[in-house]
């Protein structure tokens, strides 16, 4: 009986802890607005503006087609640059 009560209290505590420490998804877009505004003023601050070199046709691309200039990787080789 005591073990059952301890288990119930532990589950309730862990459930409450999960809700308390979880991110508030309702305000997620509000928190991104100041950052986006800052990135518009300073384009260098945006990580998405960084350009990475892409692989040309015939280059080994692994399984990630996003590394190819054409974004098309078939049998681990970039196609159509």
Curated annotation (Swiss-Prot):
Signal peptide (residue range): 1-22
Keywords carried by this UniProt record: Cleavage on pair of basic residues, Disulfide bond, Ion channel impairing toxin, Knottin, Neurotoxin, Presynaptic neurotoxin, Secreted, Signal, Toxin, Voltage-gated sodium channel impairing toxin
Cleaved propeptide residues: 23-51
Tissue-wise expression: Expressed by the venom duct.
SS bond list: 54-69, 61-73, 68-78
Superkingdom of origin: Eukaryota
One GO CC term, this protein: extracellular region
MF GO annotations: sodium channel inhibitor activity; toxin activity
Subcellular location: Secreted
UniProt KW Disulfide bond keyword: yes
Record flagged with keyword Secreted: yes
PROSITE patterns, A to Z: DELTA_CONOTOXIN
InterPro entries, per the entry: Conotoxin, Conotoxin_d-typ_CS, Conotoxin_omega-typ_CS
One protein family per Pfam: Conotoxin
Family: Belongs to the conotoxin O1 superfamily.
Role of this protein: Delta-conotoxins bind to site 6 of voltage-gated sodium channels (Nav) and inhibit the inactivation process.
Domain characteristics, as noted in the entry: The presence of a 'disulfide through disulfide knot' structurally defines this protein as a knottin. The cysteine framework is VI/VII (C-C-CC-C-C).
Designated name of the protein: Delta-conotoxin-like Ac6.3
């Amino acid at each position: 009986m005591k073990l059952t009560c301890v288990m119930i209290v532990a589950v309730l505590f862990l459930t409450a802890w999960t809700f308390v420490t979880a991110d508030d998804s309702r305000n997620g877009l509000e928190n991104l607005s100041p950052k986006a505004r800052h990135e518009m003023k300073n384009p260098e601050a945006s990580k998405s503006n960084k350009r990475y070199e892409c692989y040309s046709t015939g280059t080994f691309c692994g399984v990630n087609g996003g590394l190819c200039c054409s974004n098309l990787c078939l049998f681990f080789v970039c196609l159509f640059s």
